């Protein structure tokens, strides 16, 4: 019977079956040739969002020559970076004839910045901008509450709640001056006994409205 070895092809024996024994010793030889399409796998693991563990993202089923060294090639994944130092990494190995070689590569999840900014004129008394946040790729982001400023209407932030992309995000908002901001005009009358004006009595008060942070002038009665 022919000899066998996992991942190899046997050449066959050098003599056919059933030969007649000559008057001398006989050595029958055979050889093995490594198969060129022996199977092995490369597994690609991505870091979890919730913790520092990893989840299998992709498996490559590849072939190569038995008992030669296979080296895994890192792939490009949006929002992830290859980490050649991650625990459990098997970047290269001998292609076993039985197809049992499994190479393993790990990719850490990138983090990006979420920044808030006002555009246009920022009125006095405007809410402080939310602090910059560093967020992992794929994480849910809750946008801050609307900003406020006395006498102004806020446009709203430029984004609603979103899933963190593989890039920094700047969220903007602006203020518009209200046109119905109230102000008061007080008309004071001279005292009957002297030339003074009493701030608390003999006064006519008007409540008017106008655009915040614009100049106005009182009209005499």
Task: Go through the PLM ranges and name each one.
Residues 1-221:
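Secondary-structure capping and domain/repeat boundary segments
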């Amino acid at each position: 019977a022919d000899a066998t070895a996992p991942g190899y092809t046997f050449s066959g024996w050098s003599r056919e079956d059933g030969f007649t024994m000559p008057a001398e010793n006989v050595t029958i030889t055979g050889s093995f040739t490594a198969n060129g399409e022996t199977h092995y796998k490369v597994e690609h693991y991505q870091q979890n969002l919730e913790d520092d563990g990893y989840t299998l993202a992709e498996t490559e089923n590849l072939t190569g020559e038995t008992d030669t060294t296979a080296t895994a090639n890192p792939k490009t994944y949006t929002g992830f970076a290859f980490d050649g130092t991650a625990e459990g990494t098997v970047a290269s190995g001998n292609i076993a004839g039985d197809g049992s070689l499994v190479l393993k590569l790990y990719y850490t999840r990138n983090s990006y910045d979420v920044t808030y900014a006002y555009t246009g004129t920022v009125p006095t008394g405007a809410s402080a901008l939310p602090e910059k946040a560093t967020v992992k790729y794929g994480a849910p982001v809750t946008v801050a509450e609307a900003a406020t400023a006395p006498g102004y209407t806020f446009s709203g932030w430029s984004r609603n709640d979103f899933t963190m992309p593989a890039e920094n995000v700047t969220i903007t908002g602006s203020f518009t001056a209200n046109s119905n901001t109230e102000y008061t005009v007080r008309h004071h009358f001279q005292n009957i006994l002297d030339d003074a004006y009493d701030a608390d009595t003999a006064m006519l008060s008007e409540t008017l409205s106008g655009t915040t942070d614009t100049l106005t002038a009182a009209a005499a009665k």
